[in-house]
């Protein structure tokens, strides 16, 4: 069975409203919360695969605000050189553009060849790898990283994310 992990209840509520039976779990915000939740969910629920779904900021303006993308790989932005391991997704949902992402604790960290940034992805993929559970990541871009917070389109991007998850979920049932 496939479970969907979503960082916040706000992001999850739209998916639950549209699809009450969706197998949604809350991952929490940030690397520590996402790692702990992912490990607990794997240990307690023994899923066949996991999909992390949430919003992200884009550093590359070729990625549109409100576009939904699949993350091919994640890096922890603040780690130096040899410690900057790339965590690859185990599968890519069909029909989505793929991007590289930085996992960071704050917005606007140097992009280093990535198109988007978020706060949970590398931790999620690292735990999936450690437990041998296939993991994928889907993100809806809510803003550009240099936009003021007042310009972020969180609700609209979360709505697009929910519609995309509903569309791809049958592929993994």
Identify the residue ranges that each predicted region occupies.
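Glycine-rich phosphate- or other oxyanion-binding loops that anchor nucleotides, phosphorylated ligands
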Residues: 9-173
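Extreme N-terminal starter segment of soluble prokaryotic enzymes
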Residues: 1-3
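Protease-domain processing segments flanking chymotrypsin-fold serine proteases, especially trypsin-like
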Residues: 5-7
